[in-house]
Amino acid sequence: MIKIDKKLINNLFDKAVASDRKRMNYDLRTSPNDGGQRMLNVLLPGTKVPIHRHPNSNENVLCLSGKLVEVLYEENSCNMTVGVETQDRAEGLLLKEYARILLDPSVGSYGCVVPAGVWHTVEVNEPAVIYEAKDGRYGEDGTETWGL
């Protein structure tokens, strides 16, 4: 059994503060045979989560505390950069921001489900704890990072 309590969360915050990445996750799987990913993630302002997508799974995100924004992008295959909303170009693939979802339990906005295949990242406004779940083992789930 894994007990999710203040002691665990405080320990994760301490590790996130000490981390250059300004974040720390905690694996909630209880068996190496478990095919899905379920984790707590502590995120601090200034952390850089690369834009990425999970082609084979939705990503379920619940915010337990703090405040962050889930940013979603759509693809625009084109050879020219157009408009200020275009983030960058990699191999002719342009990404355009199309949605920002505030996750803030203090105002009743608890989470979201990022559809399979949608490019996304997060912007952390306040130190936050999120629960993430998606199908597939880490490294075998088809996750793609944009621009790398």
Regions found by a protein language model. Give the residues of each.
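A short, N-terminal "cap"/entry segment at the start of jelly-roll beta-barrel domains
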Residues: 1-36, 50, 81-102
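Conserved short histidine dyad/triad with adjacent acidic residue
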Residues: 40-55
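Structural motif
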Residues: 48, 67, 127-129
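Short hydrophobic/aromatic-rich beta-strand segments that constitute the beta-sheet cores
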Residues: 50, 70-72, 132
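Glycine- and acidic-residue-biased ligand/ion/polar-headgroup-sensing regions
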Residues: 56-78
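A short hydrophobic beta-strand segment most commonly corresponding to one strand
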Residues: 60, 121, 127-143
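Conserved metal-binding segment of the jelly-roll/cupin
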Residues: 103-126, 133
